Regions:
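Conserved N-terminal helical subregion
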Residues: 2, 54, 67-68, 73-97
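Glycine-rich FAD pyrophosphate-binding loop
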Residues: 8, 12, 19-44
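Gly/Ser/Thr-rich beta-alpha loop segments that engage phosphate groups in nucleotides
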Residues: 13-18, 47-49, 95-97
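Short, functional N-terminal and low-complexity linear motifs
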Residues: 16-25, 68-74
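Short amphipathic alpha-helical segments, especially helix-boundary/capping motifs
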Residues: 26-32, 47, 75-82
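Generic secondary-structure boundary signal with a strong preference for alpha-helix termini
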Residues: 28-29, 35, 57-58, 64, ...
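N-terminal FAD cofactor-binding segment of flavoenzymes
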Residues: 40-76
């Protein structure tokens, strides 16, 4: 069976999903081709940086305000460093989980 679409997206990860959303919202017929059966486990995949939050906002995907994170904490032995996310004109001053 063959099907014709306006936009074929290879890979259903973050970039492919964003491309598919934008294409569909622009009126294109879209097909996403993903080799994996479903999503995969990724240890660091739950944390969103301010850049990722801005990208989701640009796609009109809501972020639950109760799951905001204000920065990073790094621990090496007994040393602990905390770094707040800086707020810029391009990105919010928070990430999300």
């Amino acid at each position: 069976m063959s099907e014709q679409v306006d936009l074929a997206v290879i890979g259903g990860g973050p970039a492919g999903s964003a491309a598919a959303i934008r294409g569909a919202r622009a009126g294109a017929s879209v097909a996403v081709f993903e080799s994996g059966e479903r999503g995969r486990d990724k240890i660091c995949g739950d944390g969103l940086t301010p850049r990722a939050v801005a990208a989701l906002k640009e796609l009109d995907i809501p972020i639950d305000a109760s799951h905001r994170i204000s920065g990073l904490r790094m621990i090496a032995g007994r040393q602990i460093r905390e770094l707040p996310w800086p707020e810029t004109d391009r990105f919010p001053g928070y990430g999300a989980v």
